[in-house]
Regions:
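S-adenosyl-L-methionine
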Residues: 1-6, 20, 42-71
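Conserved SAM-binding motif I beta-strand of class I
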Residues: 30-35
Length: 225
């Protein structure tokens, strides 16, 4: 979801695989790879050297985006950490985040908190997709500074676990993702019922997820006709 970048910042780069991929695929001219772990940065440097890309990769020991100037990176990637942490990283250096042409985020969890932060702080989601890795579906969000896009009339204003763009794009992993959300809440509901309680909030979420599944199925059906 990054392309044509002059300088990309890979935040929490770990061993540098994303940084190197951006360079190898021509998606970025240069990359600043940062992490709070010196050993991880050393491995990122070794990988770049092995691939002959060391002149285009700079590694920085840094907490979040603290090292970035306000106009330094035109693309930012923050992947493989919790949504709340991603939000805190963006909030700690809003000038750099706001001035970037795009920010690509892949939260491991906490998608609701991240979406709330983006909407509250006037970031516009410009693309979304789902990826399947090791049996788990992850949401990838691409955003930039700007007024949030208006929500479709059928989409609740207080929904942050999923985005309407995934419905509009007919993402093939959307229905499996919604089913996994619903089934997780069903398990929690069954556990609560064994204790003699039926939380209304859980039943409402399950009903909402079933509604989303029906909408997604109808969209796929209409596209096929």
């Amino acid at each position: 979801m990054i392309n044509g970048s002059r300088l990309s910042a890979d935040i929490g780069c770990d061993h540098g695989r994303l940084s190197v991929a951006l360079l190898q695929q021509g998606r970025a001219d240069r990359v600043i790879a940062s992490d709070i772990s010196a050993p991880s940065l050393q491995k990122a440097t070794e990988l770049a050297t092995l691939c002959g890309l060391e002149s285009r990769l700079t590694t920085v020991l840094s907490d979040g985006m603290a090292h970035l100037g306000p106009d330094e990176a035109d693309a930012i990637a923050i992947c493989g950490m919790g949504g709340e942490l991603i939000a805190r990283i963006l909030e700690a250096n809003l000038p750099a985040a706001k001035n970037a042409r795009c920010i690509t985020m892949q939260p491991m969890r906490g998608i609701e908190e991240l979406r709330q932060f983006l909407r509250k702080n006037e970031f516009r989601i410009i693309d979304e997709r789902l990826v399947l890795d090791a049996g788990r579906i992850y949401q990838i969000i691409r955003a930039k500074s700007g007024d949030p896009a208006p929500l479709p009339g059928w989409f609740p204003q207080d929904e942050y676990s999923i985005g309407p763009m995934l419905f509009e794009k007919r993402d093939p992993l959307l229905i499996p993702l919604l089913e996994s959300y619903r089934d997780g809440h069903l398990r929690r509901l069954e556990k609560a019922r064994r204790k003699g309680v039926t939380p209304k909030a859980l039943t409402e979420i399950i009903d909402r997820m079933n509604g989303y599944i029906n909408i997604a199925q109808e969209m796929h059906k209409n596209e096929a006709e």
